[in-house]
């Protein structure tokens, strides 16, 4: 019996837990957490523990598929390549779009965006950060000059106070949740603000329920109190920031009493948490999708930055603004330039000098300076007939994007559609060509977690059938389409990473030898003698002048508000046992724990509607309706209902609003849309 242990990184959330894949007879039969790994320290959440169950499933894609007369047939790689190459070459580049995969290693994503830009000639490149932490990238870049988490996870344990807003870490990021609980055990005061009384909120020293979508008003009122009480860090503000007087003027009108009317948080409670946050020597802000997934998500993110700068809680252990990122490599996907506005390393597409530098490095011709379309814009353009061809790698927008009917309409309206994935997803069913890809356990490369830690993943087993690495597929297609072979010839993922270092300044000092250790390296790491950067903005911010920028912001509220026809606000969330659906619902152990969805409804709302616990109800919005079981609970604010987003048979995204978009980031408003709930016909 031949058993080996292959160290790698979990493929689910952005925490980046280390694990060993247990391989027996060339199959992955289990996982063991790394005991020495600095992130998870010998622990894993349920998703990590059972991630191996999807690797050898019989429904893995193993050969290219081409749709003819509405049915898929098996095809050779050459057939598939010829068809794809002919279609990509037949349309104007502006009529073609790419969704990159934030689950995929950095090396795959880098080659994907390079192929789209050089070979196809389009900046219509995006990935799922648009639907989770796009506002983080835009908001923190505007405030601090860098759109990423400021501190490391380990830093939480040095905090005196932790303010968690819009983050249910014990379910969505359990091993970060563990560090927060350890901080609390060390004496940190733990405040949780959330419309739902989540498992994380139940561990708080102080829980603040508030009306979804009113984060700006809540934090403006907190800053009003801090300034009124003279608790702002005057020295930090003077030496390290600008635009303070403009901020002060705006927040002056947001008294706690005014904010109470907006947020439903009592004025005395707002005063209390503001003073506690300001008086703490080291206070950390933690947030996640409850902050970002709004039509004013960038404003929410910039408010967290305002609050931290106002009190000098930046650049020290136990402080900072700490977004908990979504997918395992969503940070890396942003770093690699899977964005319509940015090349690798966040260098701007619109900057002529940047474009000239990139073309010189890559050895290609003019790439143009017009930014491309974001994911919601590509979906809209496809629905209108302006986007003709779409190439999706490892994304499932039929499940994950808002307004499912709109997404399906858009996909049906395409002239040509390619999906590259490991399973026949709900989205892949719409495709003209489906290509089989290797999963994370079947390849080498790097993932970058939410704290900017770049970590190696290692191949444990061969990919099934004729599956290929994503980077290999794009290189094959590039050559098929006549690209210079030297631009797309790599022997390994390591070769690609060496090129990444030349175009991504934050990664310049990293090499395999330095990454081949449990602690790996945090970016920015500009040279090989640089130790990496676990904590950012210690002496200056990343703006050219080194100053942080206060952003005065007014409360906007959700774009869609309740009315007589749709009197409730729907928010959507994630569960401990699921991620999206394509993988976790195929992991038998996880799917058995929560096999289908439900709608959480406040006890008073349920009583007014005559709805009993577990009763099947109809939930309706302006975009569609679903049938789903009710879960009657006191753990959610009256007037708000919640549906987990994982379940196709009762999909929350049939209800969500694709038209409610954050103008600063393109983020759809998953956390607030108006719905009505009614009893099913014939129910008692």
Curated annotation (Swiss-Prot):
Cofactor(s) in the UniProt record: [4Fe-4S] cluster; Mo-bis(molybdopterin guanine dinucleotide); Zn(2+)
GO CC aspect terms: membrane
Coiled coil ranges: none
InterPro entries recorded: Asp_de-COase-like_dom_sf, CT_Formate-Dh_H, Formate_Dh-H_N, Formate_DH_asu, MoPterin_dinucl-bd_dom, Mopterin_OxRdtase, Mopterin_OxRdtase_4Fe-4S_dom, Mopterin_OxRdtase_prok_CS
Enzyme Commission designation: 1.17.98.3
Signal peptide: none
4Fe-4S Mo/W bis-MGD-type domain mapped to chain residues: 3-59
Residues annotated as binding [4Fe-4S] cluster: 10, 13, 17, 45
Regulation: Is extremely sensitive to oxygen. Strongly inhibited by cyanide, azide, alpha,alpha-dipyridyl and 1,10-phenanthroline.
Cofactor note: Binds 1 [4Fe-4S] cluster.
Temperature dependence: Optimum temperature is 55 degrees Celsius.
Family statement drawn from the similarity comment of this UniProt entry: Belongs to the prokaryotic molybdopterin-containing oxidoreductase family.
Self-association state and partner proteins as the record states: Dimer of an alpha (FdhA) and a beta (FdhB) subunit.
Primary role: Catalyzes the oxidation of formate to carbon dioxide, with coenzyme F420 as the electron acceptor. In vitro can also use methyl viologen, 7,8-didemethyl-8-hydroxy-5-deazariboflavin (or FO, a hydrolytic derivative of coenzyme F420), FMN and FAD as electron acceptors, but not NAD(+) or NADP(+).
Identification of the protein by name: F420-dependent formate dehydrogenase subunit alpha
Phylogenetic classification of the source organism: Archaea, Methanobacteriati, Methanobacteriota, Methanomada group, Methanobacteria
């Amino acid at each position: 019996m031949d058993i080996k242990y292959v160290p790698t990184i979990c493929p689910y959330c952005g925490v980046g837990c280390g694990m060993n894949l247990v391989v027996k007879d060339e199959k992955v039969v289990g996982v063991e957490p790394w005991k020495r790994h600095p992130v998870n320290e010998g622990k894993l959440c349920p998703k990590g523990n059972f991630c191996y169950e999807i690797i050898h499933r019989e429904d893995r894609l193993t050969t290219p598929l081409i749709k003819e007369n509405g049915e898929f047939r098996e095809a050779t790689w050459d057939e598939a390549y010829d068809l794809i190459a002919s279609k990509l070459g037949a349309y104007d580049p502006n009529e073609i779009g790419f969704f990159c995969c934030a689950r995929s290693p950095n090396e795959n994503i880098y080659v994907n965006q390079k192929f789209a830009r050089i070979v196809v000639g389009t900046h219509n490149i995006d990935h799922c950060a648009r639907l989770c932490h796009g506002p983080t990238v835009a908001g923190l870049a505007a405030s601090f000059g860098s759109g990423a988490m400021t501190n490391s996870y380990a830093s939480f344990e040095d905090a005196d106070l932790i303010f968690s807003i819009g983050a249910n870490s014990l379910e969505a990021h359990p091993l970060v949740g563990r560090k927060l609980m350890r901080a609390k055990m060390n004496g940190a005061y733990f405040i949780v603000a959330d419309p739902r009384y989540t498992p994380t909120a139940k561990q708080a020293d102080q829980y603040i329920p508030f009306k979804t979508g009113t984060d700006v008003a809540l934090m403006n009122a907190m800053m009003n109190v801090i300034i009124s009480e003279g608790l702002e860090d005057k020295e930090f503000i003077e030496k390290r920031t600008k635009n303070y007087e403009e901020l002060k003027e705006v927040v002056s009108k947001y008294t706690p009493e005014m904010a109470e009317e907006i947020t439903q948080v009592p004025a005395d409670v707002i005063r209390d948490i503001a003073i506690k946050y300001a008086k703490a020597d080291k206070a950390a802000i933690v947030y996640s999708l409850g902050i970002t997934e709004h039509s004013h998500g960038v404003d929410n993110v910039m408010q967290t930055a305002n609050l931290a700068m106002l009190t000098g809680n930046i650049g020290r252990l136990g402080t900072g603004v700490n977004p908990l990122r979504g997918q395992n490599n969503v940070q890396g996907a942003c770093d690699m330039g899977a964005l319509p506005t940015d090349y690798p390393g966040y260098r701007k597409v619109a900057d002529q000098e940047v474009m000239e530098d990139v073309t010189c490095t890559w050895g290609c011709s003019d790439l143009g300076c017009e930014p491309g379309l974001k994911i919601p814009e590509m979906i809209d353009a496809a629905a209108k007939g302006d986007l003709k061809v779409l190439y999706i790698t490892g994304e499932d927008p039929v499940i994950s994007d808002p307004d499912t009917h709109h997404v399906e309409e858009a996909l049906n309206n395409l002239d040509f559609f390619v999906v590259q994935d490991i399973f026949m997803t709900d989205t892949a069913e719409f495709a003209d060509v489906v290509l089989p890809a290797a999963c994370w356990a079947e390849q080498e490369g790097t993932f970058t977690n939410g704290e900017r830690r770049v970590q190696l993943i290692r191949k444990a087993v061969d990919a099934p059938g004729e599956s290929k690495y994503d980077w290999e597929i794009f290189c094959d297609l590039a050559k098929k389409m006549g690209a210079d072979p030297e631009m797309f010839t790599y022997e390994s993922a390591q070769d690609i990473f060496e090129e990444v270092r030349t175009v991504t300044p934050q990664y310049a000092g990293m090499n395999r030898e330095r990454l081949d250790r449990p602690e790996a390296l945090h970016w920015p790491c500009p040279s090989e003698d640089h130790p990496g950067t676990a904590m950012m903005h210690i002496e200056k911010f990343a703006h050219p002048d080194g100053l942080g920028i206060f952003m005065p912001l007014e409360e906007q509220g959700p774009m869609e508000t309740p009315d007589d026809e749709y009197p409730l606000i729907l928010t959507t969330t994630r569960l401990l046992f699921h991620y999206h659906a394509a993988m976790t619902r195929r992991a038998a152990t996880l799917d058995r724990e929560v096999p289908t969805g439900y709608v959480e409804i406040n006890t008073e709302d349920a009583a007014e509607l005559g709805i009993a616990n577990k009763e099947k109800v109809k939930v309706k919005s302006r975009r569609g309706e679903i049938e789903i079981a009710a879960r009657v609970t006191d753990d959610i604010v009256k007037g708000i209902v919640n549906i987990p987003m994982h379940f196709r048979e009762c999909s929350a995204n049939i209800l969500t609003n694709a038209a409610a978009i954050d103008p600063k980031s393109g983020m759809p408003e998953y956390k607030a849309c108006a719905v009505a709930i009614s009893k099913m016909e014939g129910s008692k």
